[in-house]
Amino acid sequence: MAYAYLFKYIIIGDTGVGKSCLLLQFTDKRFQPVHDLTIGVEFGARMITIDGKQIKLQIWDTAGQESFRSITRSYYRGAAGALLVYDITRRDTFNHLTTWLEDARQHSNSNMVIMLIGNKSDLESRREVKKEEGEAFAREHGLIFMETSAKTASNVEEAFINTAKEIYEKIQEGVFDINNEANGIKIGPQHAATNATHAGNQGGQQAGGGCC
């Protein structure tokens, strides 16, 4: 299917926070309770619609282990959006956010949109990190924030789509150079065709005007 833009995402965070489950829920609308540890990087894609335009999300799901951190870093460079995930039932995953964020900002383009996600909101009885703490961290670092549940699908759709909306707004504002694919944005065939049609119509109008 033709698309106007392609946005590249990267999902980052500690091992076991539910990164692969979030991706699977978003792309396949299913939950897999037992998931093998991601080795290196996995990949998923899905089409969404923003402002009447088809946008393809290309999502890279990274390994959380320290031993794969160098591989993860190489994927930051071409990403327009990042989902930084922690587990609300494990405080250590929240405590490590600063390290992940520093790493992301050091190795990515400065305009990358980052969504902070507190995952496993369905496990309220085991919560170790208050929602207010997530909100405060996001505010302090200029991130978008949501709590999600990959199991129940709560806010999963919204997390991916709201990140895309933010990227799309930055394109409209001229913040992103869409001709530089290093920014994690690619102009699709649909967008190019629309522009060509628009240019053709303008040319036709001008030619018609000249004949009068």
Swiss-Prot record:
PROSITE patterns in UniProt: RAB (PS51419)
Catalyses which reaction(s): GTP + H2O = GDP + phosphate + H(+)
Subcellular location, record wording: Endoplasmic reticulum-Golgi intermediate compartment membrane; Melanosome; Endoplasmic reticulum membrane; Golgi apparatus membrane
SMART domains hit by this protein: RAB, RAN, RAS, RHO
EC nos: 3.6.5.2
Gene3D superfamilies in alphabetical order: P-loop containing nucleotide triphosphate hydrolases (3.40.50.300)
Motif Switch 2, residue range(s) on this chain: 63-72
Residue positions binding Mg(2+): 20, 38, 61
Statement: the UniProt record of this protein carries the keyword Transport: yes
Binding site for GDP: 16, 18-21, 119-120, 122, 150-151
Domain notes: Switch I, switch II and the interswitch regions are characteristic of Rab GTPases and mediate the interactions with Rab downstream effectors. The switch regions undergo conformational changes upon nucleotide binding which drives interaction with specific sets of effector proteins, with most effectors only binding to GTP-bound Rab.
Quaternary structure annotation from Swiss-Prot or TrEMBL: Interacts with PRKCI. Interacts with TRIP11. Interacts (in GTP-bound form) with GARIN1B. Interacts (GTP-bound) with HOPS complex component VPS39; interaction contributes to obtaining a functional HOPS complex that promotes autophagosome-lysosome membrane fusion driven by STX17-SNAP29-VAMP8. In contrast with mouse ortholog, not able to interact with VPS41.
Function field: The small GTPases Rab are key regulators of intracellular membrane trafficking, from the formation of transport vesicles to their fusion with membranes. Rabs cycle between active GTP-bound and inactive GDP-bound states. In their active state, drive transport of vesicular carriers from donor organelles to acceptor organelles to regulate the membrane traffic that maintains organelle identity and morphology.
UniProt name for this protein: Ras-related protein Rab-2A
UniProt lineage: Eukaryota, Metazoa, Chordata, Craniata, Vertebrata
